[in-house]
């Protein structure tokens, strides 16, 4: 390939550019003296030159050199689509930059208009003020490069001058002005290798400038070919060559959006990020999520679950899916893209009192002050069964699999088959109202570093206003019914084959109980808490400290602690390995009726209209959720949320921030109870003179 060039001028050297010479009346800042022998020969001698656009004989665009009568432009007459950079402005970073040439520091200035077309440009290389004169008493020359590839060395700067304006005063008498003919009319072939050599000899900044000017004369097809070749070479894979541990450290600092964006960079990155499943485990913990029974079954379908579940008990490989499930569940509740659906239906409740509410699978179970137990379908609202047998109000109810156990003001405990809607067993023995119930089933736990299972069989424990607790065996589904006639003979009911023993010790009504495995915690109006081993009836601890009645207790088996809330407005955390009080939590202004624990947080509800969240490890308060007025009648919580009822409304809170997200229900006369599962919230409420069950479905479909 050969190109044409202009012959070299004897009086001045040339460099390839397409820029007019800068003519400025302002002298340059004096630098160090200039020695032509140390300046690059490629800039002083014109033996290797880049061609101008109008010198490329082989370009078919040169057939027409006029556009709308303008014959002075060196750019061929073409449309802007074919030549995308034809009218593009020179980027600012190409117009002003610094260069170091042969130990001389130069500031390169382009003084042509930013929107100049190719062929209309000029450059000056101005020596910098802070250059030390080391080579000569004379300062370095200002180098001016014009559009016809000529270089002008200006020696008009005095090194003794004290005033150094920013740009040079250039004598244009020895230069060729824009638009004039080359010095010689003789043309000779210019070898492509010499063009490349000249380009390589240019300073980096001028290379970039010159290359952009060439691109302005390239058509779209040529630019596309260049892009296709260059783009892959300019990309550098910053992950593939790094050690696994460093990549992991980088990824753990990304948010989810950035992490997912990285997966789209390339198939290689996608494969790398697929391997780093520990990222999802890290995010799982960062979001405050906790694995549950379903997660364990998903990851270990053939293994028995450990006594207590922790995030590190499941392999990292399963966490992408586990995180997704928890994250979407949180989003459905806290930030739903589809508004939750709402099903409301009235229920018949004499005296308008719903004493308890349970959401069990697709069934809603309610008990009332009339003694009836109703089972409604949670999807349709249809009444599926009405369990009748208690003579007075039912104040306590528990469920285990297909068995429902109820305790009543009529002093009896009844056992029901849910599917058959039938009472199978009646237990008598208490001489006053049954106020609380618990079902304890064989559970795996760690004691003294050894994994054990206790108790050896399921038990029912009932607490009564007669100051006692009674322990019964939980009947099996295959056991025959036990339905003795009513009698006033207490001795006869002591012979009940399901009766185990009576727990005696409290001196006032047993108000609340909580248990796990073989351990039961009871709270009484006698202001004390007792810890029992259910299978033997032994009282392990008698905990004193509260000054008034106990309204709520909670047993936390993993930490081996229990928590009590009292009418004295305080909460106490007890260490059951020593029987001592660890913390006294104060802040509520009324009696504490509700307690719940999740992970390291204790949540308490009080008649002072507030919900408080505490750090269970330190006993320090974390936040207060104010609820206007009215005592907190009910609340439920999990790793994402708190749902509370008071002040005529049901509210949804973010458990991590304490922020009130929305009102689920408003304009209520009374809220008795709330409950929820993975997809639904159910509330038993009263509007005016009618009781209702409200089902709010967050699954994105009609309940």
UniProtKB/Swiss-Prot annotation:
Its main location: cytoplasm. The keyword Membrane does not apply. One of its GO terms (biological process) is SCF-dependent proteasomal ubiquitin-dependent protein catabolic process. Keywords: Cytoplasm, Nucleus, Repeat, Ubl conjugation pathway, WD repeat. It is found in: Cytoplasm; Nucleus. The keyword Cell membrane does not apply. One of its GO terms (molecular function) is ubiquitin-like ligase-substrate adaptor activity. Residues 1-27, 63-73, 156-178 have a biased composition (Polar residues). Pfam families: F-box, WD40. Residues 236-283 form the F-box domain. Residues 1-170 are annotated as: Interaction with pop1. One of its GO terms (cellular component) is SCF ubiquitin ligase complex. Residues 1-73, 156-180 are annotated as: Disordered. Gene3D superfamilies: 1.20.1280.50, YVTN repeat-like/Quinoprotein amine dehydrogenase (2.130.10.10). WD repeats lie at residues 389-417, 429-473, 505-533, 545-575, 587-615, 625-654. Homodimer and heterodimer with pop1. Binds to cul1, pip1 and phosphorylated cdc18. Involved in maintenance of ploidy through proteasome dependent degradation of CDK inhibitor rum1 and S-phase initiator cdc18. Functions as a recognition factor for rum1 and cdc18, which are subsequently ubiquitinated and targeted to the 26S proteasome for degradation. Together with pop1, required for cig2 instability during G2 and M phase and cig2 degradation in exponentially growing cells. This is WD repeat-containing protein pop2.
